[in-house]
Every structure is written in structure tokens, then in C-alpha cells.
């Protein structure tokens, strides 16, 4: 992963996502609803605890979080969402994974296909690009105000169960096996650390630089996908400088 900081990619798109905060909250509410159907108590439901932490990290109001949990707990309408993943390529051969939660697969697949086709991309079959990504736990700790040195922190994180640690001037990035993510997170929390990001995510095994003549179409395609109410996450192997 060295040299391909996910944190840099996150920061590179942060302003655009902040401008759509209400849509972010709407999508998180759906994710909370789905997780809470497995149980409303986050201490007994790791999936709910994880998405609640994700919601709090973007300052989603507690009332919104509680409302989504209550809706799932008292759901008698039969409302339900299926998890669906779409795979394909953006212009220039950039691999794209689209994760959706939908109550209408036909609607979502049509919208996703249009987003690809209208912007020079192509939707592929299951397995066409997913082999280029690994699922990992991902934690980010801001270094501002910390006194711990790099070697000391790296040792601490590895002893907590981390698979890898990347160090930059501003942040520590910690990568874990998905199965040990919660364990590592809790160990570092108990050591006094707080997280700017804590999530399970997909990471490219190889990054692909976007050619300048493909950048506009690529940006439009990502915007179209992220604007879709059913799309929860979009992962690519684009390298953002």
C-alpha cells in the first residue's frame, strides 16, 4: 500500500462530499436501518456499532441515528433492502466497484448501467474487477497533538493486531484483517487513541493513474453513481495525486 495513501484519496474528494451532506445522512440512515434489523443494541451488534461510528465521524445528528434504529426495531411495513454489488470499468480502464442497498434491483441496475454508459464506462459481469480489490479494516489517527514517535506507534499497532501501518506527516493509517478489525480498534481506543476514520473498505491491489483526457468523464461518472440514492459506496483503483 505504500505510496498510495487512501487518506489522500479521501481528502481529495472530501469537499465534494461535504456539499452533499444531507444525501450522505440519508444513505447512512439506510445502512443503519439494515444493520439494526439484526438487533438494536450496538454493544451486541458489531455491524450496527460500526455504522454508528461511521455516522458519528461525519457528524450525523444523534436524532437521525436513533430514528433509523427505531424504524428498524418497529418495522412492520415489510420494508427491506438487498445488498448488491456492481462491477465495471470507467474511462481509461479504471476498475470500479459499486455497493448498493436497494428495495428495487431493476431500478438500481438500470441507473448504474446508465451512469457507466453515459460517461464512457462499461458495466461488467460479477467477478470482472472484484479480484483487483481486497477487503480490509482501515483506521486513521491524526498525528496532530500526539507525542508518540513513529516506531513506537507502529509497534503498538502491530501488537494490537494490525497487519500494516503507513505513516505520513499528518496521519497514521492502520490496516487490519476484517476479522480482527474490531479487536484492533478497541485495543487502540483503550490506549487512548481516537479515529478520524474507522471502517471496513475495499482496497485496490494495483492503482491506475487517470489519463488527463479521461478525467472529466471519470468525475462525471463517479458523481452520477454517488448521487444515486441506492448507491452506498463506490470504490475505484484510480490513483488521485
Curated annotation (Swiss-Prot):
This is Probable transcriptional regulatory protein lmo1535. Its main location: cytoplasm. NCBIfam families: PRK00110.1 (NF001030), PRK12378.1 (NF009044), YebC/PmpR family DNA-binding transcriptional regulator (TIGR01033). It comes from the Bacteria. Belongs to the TACO1 family. InterPro entries: Integrase-like_N, TACO1_YebC-like_2nd/3rd_dom, TACO1_YebC_N, Transcrip_reg_TACO1-like, Transcrip_reg_TACO1-like_dom3, YebC-like. It is found in: Cytoplasm. The keyword DNA-binding applies. Residues 1-14 have a biased composition (Polar residues). Pfam families: TACO1_YebC_N, Transcrip_reg. One of its GO terms (molecular function) is DNA binding. It comes from Listeria monocytogenes serovar 1/2a (strain ATCC BAA-679 / EGD-e). GO terms for cellular component: cytosol. The keyword Metal-binding does not apply. GO terms for biological process: regulation of DNA-templated transcription. Keywords: Cytoplasm, DNA-binding, Transcription, Transcription regulation. Residues 1-22 are annotated as: Disordered.
Amino acid at each position: 500500500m505504500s505510496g498510495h495513501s487512501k487518506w489522500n484519496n479521501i481528502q481529495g474528494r472530501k469537499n465534494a462530499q461535504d456539499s452533499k451532506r444531507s444525501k450522505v445522512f440519508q444513505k447512512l440512515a439506510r445502512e443503519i436501518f439494515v444493520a439494526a434489523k439484526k438487533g438494536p443494541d450496538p454493544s451486541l451488534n458489531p455491524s450496527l456499532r460500526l455504522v454508528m461510528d461511521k455516522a458519528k465521524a461525519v457528524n450525523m445528528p444523534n436524532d437521525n441515528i436513533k430514528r433509523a434504529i427505531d424504524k428498524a426495531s418497529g418495522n412492520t411495513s415489510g420494508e427491506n433492502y438487498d445488498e448488491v454489488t456492481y462491477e465495471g470499468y470507467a474511462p481509461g480502464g479504471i476498475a470500479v466497484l459499486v455497493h448498493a442497498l436497494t428495495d428495487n434491483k431493476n431500478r438500481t441496475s438500470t441507473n448504474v448501467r446508465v451512469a457507466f454508459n453515459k460517461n464512457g464506462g462499461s458495466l461488467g459481469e460479477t467477478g470482472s474487477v472484484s479480484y483487483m480489490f481486497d477487503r480490509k479494516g482501515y483506521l486513521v489517527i491524526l498525528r496532530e497533538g500526539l507525542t508518540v514517535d513513529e516506531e513506537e506507534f507502529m509497534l503498538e499497532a502491530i501488537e494490537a493486531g494490525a497487519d500494516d501501518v503507513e505513516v505520513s506527516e499528518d496521519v497514521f493509517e492502520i490496516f487490519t484483517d476484517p476479522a480482527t478489525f474490531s479487536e484492533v480498534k478497541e485495543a487502540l481506543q483503550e490506549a487512548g487513541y481516537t479515529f478520524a476514520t474507522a471502517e471496513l473498505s475495499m482496497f485496490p491491489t494495483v492503482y491506475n493513474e487517470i489519463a488527463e483526457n479521461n478525467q472529466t468523464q471519470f468525475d462525471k461518472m463517479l458523481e452520477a453513481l454517488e448521487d444515486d440514492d441506492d448507491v452506498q459506496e463506490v470504490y475505484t483503483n484510480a490513483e488521485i495525486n
